[in-house]
Amino acid sequence: MADRSKGFMRAEFVTYAYILLYIALSSGQIFFNKWVLSSKEINFPYPLGLTLLHMIFSSVLCFLLTKVLKIVKVEEGMTLEIYVTSVIPIGAMFAMTLWLGNTAYLYISVAFAQMLKAIMPVAVFILGVAAGLEMMSCRMLLIMSIISFGVLVASYGELNINWIGVVYQMGGVVGEALRLIFMELLVKRKGIKLNPISLMYYVSPCSAICLFVPWIFLEKSKIDGNGPWNFHFVVLTLNSLCTFALNLSVFLVISHTSALTIRVAGVVKDWVVVLVSALLFADTKLTIINLFGYAIAIAGVAAYNNHKLKKEASKVVTTETPGDAESIPLVSQGNTNTER
């Protein structure tokens, strides 16, 4: 009995450790990206190049983990037809999301960017209805209205609003919503389930190619114009490694808990980012209106996640089989973008 109790406590400790690791890495990566892009010491104001570096690093590490070291097994079922019709669009939207989201940090504060991202469920719902994946209902309209109202109030309370940054951030939100829609279409039409490492194994190279083309035309000339490349490669490598570690932490949390846990942790992370950024960055000045509006939006997001999880749970009960805990569907309606 004592051994069983110790084993349970040990399992609980490990679970909470993974959750705290996810919150720390997710929050820290956002601050890390902001610092790399805006710091004069690092001198790397190239969001497209930073995102491209992340995807190349992720591609190499995923290849090493799955094909060389064989620590993680790549999920089977991927075909050329699925890759062309589903993975490439997902990779393109993923690249667009990270690129525009990182670019927004050059114009707006981390806290305000996080507040704007709360509108994500609204974009996903609207596109989902257009794609035939969501049904319009009074309850969902009420939830979407609450989220939208909260984001509007938070935006109204922003002291130093920069509309260029807002446009970039909203573009990132639309890209992420499209990515989630493509992923849900892939799940419903093909029935493919991948763990995060397998997902990044397939998506990262595609995203890297999608980013490389605009990088050649938009940023390479700027970098070359500043003289010989003399960047802090240790810092950039560490930044890329932290991004990959964040993706791995998502895998660990989901495999030891559930999708509900990662979403609750995501809400906690959002508040941590908003509050801590006010202490770390001089461009972040929170107001009572900011926080009040964001609280309203988060309440709407929580209601949305609860509604979606109940809907998903009713499906899982009849279809779940042993071993499913280590694979997650290629869809997440919450704000779980790991690199922004």
Swiss-Prot record:
Q: Which residues form the signal peptide?
A: none
Q: Which InterPro entries match?
A: Sugar_P_trans_dom (IPR004853), TPT_transporter (IPR050186)
Q: Which residue ranges run through the membrane?
A: 12-32, 44-64, 80-100, 110-130, 141-161, 163-183, 197-217, 234-254, 260-282, 286-305
Region of interest (Disordered), ranges: 320-340
Q: For this UniProt record, give its keywords in alphabetical order, as a comma-separated list.
A: Membrane, Sugar transport, Transmembrane, Transmembrane helix, Transport
Q: Where is the composition biased (Polar residues)?
A: 330-340
- What are the subcellular locations of this protein? Membrane
Please give, as recorded in its UniProt entry, the membrane topology of this protein: Multi-pass membrane protein
> What does UniProt give as GO cellular component?
cytosolic ribosome; membrane
Q: Which family does it belong to?
A: Belongs to the TPT transporter family. TPT (TC 2.A.7.9) subfamily.
Name assigned to this protein: Probable sugar phosphate/phosphate translocator At3g14410
